Amino acid sequence: MQVDKGMPIRVVKADNCIVCGHCVDVCPKHAIEHSEIPYEKVHKIDYKAMPTAEQLMNLFHARRSNRTFTDRSLQERAVEQIIEAGYYAPTAVNNRQVHIKLINDEDTLRQVFEYVVDTFSEMALDMRVRGEESTDDGYFSAPMLEGLVKAAKRGKDPILRGTHNLLIFTSSHRMGLRDCQLAYQNASLMAQVLGISQVYMGYVCNAYENGDRQRLKDILGVEDEIQAVMALGIPSFVYTSYTER
């Protein structure tokens, strides 16, 4: 839209519209209509209800990767709020191609666990064959991978940490990785507010990067690229202090 002093507001270059909603949201009188944005989907922002800087910093201090998941169930509404928060993260050129899927079926979770174990077994063997002690980035070593596999075969869960809920962030957009990471951060902060522990599933993501990608997509029932995975659960304790950084 274009505004010239003393002249009516004009629509210019309508074909370039990315449906971001900024033109509608900026009008204090709700006087702008957009063919792609129904009126009932436009809501007022209550700036008086914003958290203070101190309150927001307290949230940052409290957020941790607390892997002590209990068997307590998550409320459906809480999960919906976490996912909604993720969808309100910005995306490149407003592509909005981030998809967030909840996985809480025990059989599917078991298959994800087995996928990671199988992939790590193959990675460790390949490293041994090539005579390499660690991956190029130094993140994995053959002994580390073998240790994780052995622990899993002994009945422990160093992969999913016993979670009953995974959020899968997917996007095939060229900026999909960045978009999903932003969505993850929004979702993780909402989880913290709700008293739900969230943990980044790095092992799952690394197995996906180094293993049979289509196999994991089929297990999870997704088509786009897997960019981030979050585990959710009620923690058995909370941290009462934080250490300065």
Regions found by a protein language model. Give the residues of each.
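Acidic, surface-exposed loops and disordered segments
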Residues: 1-245
